[in-house]
Amino acid sequence: MKNKIISIIICILMFIGVISISACNLTTVDNRSDNIVILYENDVHCVVEGYSKLSAMKKELNETYKHVGVVSGGDYIQGSSLGVISQGEYIIKLMNLVGYDAVTLGNHEFDYRLERLEELVNMMDTKPICCNFNAIGEDEPYFEPYSMVSYGNVDIAYIGITTPTTISSSSPTQFRDENGEPIYTFNPNTLYDIVQNNIDSAKSAGAEYVIALSHIGYADDAIYGELEDIETLIKNTDGFDVVLDAHSHSVIEEKLIIDEGGNEVVLSSTGTKFEYIGKLVISDGEFDTQLIKTSEYQKTDTAVDTYLEQINSEYSELGKRKVGYSEVD
């Protein structure tokens, strides 16, 4: 009888142990930081090698942070023969492999004409945003003006803004009809109001933070209509928390600009051609930006590297094609 009781006790203890182990397995604690990290780039201009490092950095940070995103300030599909040969397709496929949360349009996204841009948009996993481009006579923008992305229980709105000088700097005939009359506009004279309306709309939709992906910059050709440069845009609007800028290839790690409402706005830009990768950390309403020298980051992503090898091989084969000959020595 005594042995039977001991056996029963042992069985009960073993059963309790199994339940305890199972419970431990089911309640694994995620000790990663709740801070939000946004990696950003601008004006890459087809320097495709940087995408592998960007993807690797995203994955590495995701080991420490629960919420890691990637965004672009535009001018990614133009800048080298890789872009020209594929009419931007190689670049879009690379960006899909990295996985972007939001992208805007630079002036050079229109270089292959609007019809081709529409084809590329259909290939994109993340559709571009641009609040200030529309057909004349239409109230709605041609592309979605902003996108809302959830990071845990925090909603961030990204608003896309493209330089109004695109109308004259990127295949200008595509923006006019056969009679030379304008049929599209980037709204140079009402830009501040358009941007402000979208800030207000995003906040009404529940955005806790609002970030601009602006392709404006400080370039000499940025003066068009009421706009002088990115700082005048910030000073004439109210509600941005962070502005990630592009177009002038400026290197700005962090600059504080006071907006129309008297609030500090963080301004940053990564230069061009993946010279830097930007890192924005959001922690309880605080915003910190830093620039990481891409050449000093050594990790790469295997999947992106594999595709880079593929497109380089295709590019090499295309370069061997005979397109003509000359009888002149």
Regions found by a protein language model. Give the residues of each.
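Generic cytosolic/nucleocytoplasmic N-terminal low-complexity/intrinsically disordered segments
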Residues: 1-3, 30
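Sec-dependent N-terminal signal peptides of Gram-positive bacterial secreted proteins and lipoproteins
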Residues: 4-26
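N-terminal hydrophobic alpha-helix used for membrane targeting or insertion
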Residues: 6-7, 11, 32, 64, ...
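Short, flexible coil/linker elements and helix-boundary hinge sites characteristic
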Residues: 17, 23, 65, 180, ...
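Acidic, metal/ion-coordinating pockets
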Residues: 25-300
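Hard-cation-handling environments
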Residues: 289, 298-329
